[in-house]
Amino acid sequence: MLRAVFFATRMEAERVLAEKKFGYKQICAEPFRVWRNRRNLIVITGIGLVNASVAFAWAARKFRFGDVLNVGAAGATAFGGKPVEMGKFYKISKVVCLEPYNEMAFRLGRAGRALVSSGSPVSTREEREYAGKFAPLVDMEGYALARAAEVFGKKISMVKMVTDFSHECDIFGNIKKMSEKFAQMEGVWI
């Protein structure tokens, strides 16, 4: 059965999609862009909690897939524990949400780092300190995808790369580097 891989942006998936040996062909352009090879569906959700949850629900109704993988960028918070490193990949073990009325925590595995998801960018020092009370990594889609996976009975795993740690970072340059590193993980894509 196919695995569904969710990216927030095309930029994150760019090198994987461009690599001919992976054999991805675009099969859908609206309402979400989707590519497929023999092993995976790649779905571009758009940025944010709402886009991620809607894309997951749409994909779950339109395509047959088994396990789910969310791959993408994450920011470093001002977490008081073991720090995360810029440019490094982290497997996510737990996902929580910064937004009110989203108190559930999702355990994705025993090993890895915690991730907190936010409905808006976490870019100021104060915002990073607040997010750091919950997890060392922050994104804008993980919680929504974990919640949707639970609703649709899918096992989800997540891999995030630290692309930013302050408002002054070159997040777009770092995401391009991340995309190149993702494409080097051949076993995931073929």
Where are these regions (language model features)?
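Short, solvent-exposed amphipathic alpha-helical segments in soluble enzyme
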Residues: K20-F22, A59
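Gly/serine-rich nucleotide phosphate-binding loop at the start of the catalytic core
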Residues: F6-V16
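Ordered hydrophobic segments in well-structured contexts
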Residues: A4, A8, F32-V34
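Glycine-rich phosphate- or other oxyanion-binding loops that anchor nucleotides, phosphorylated ligands
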Residues: I27-I190
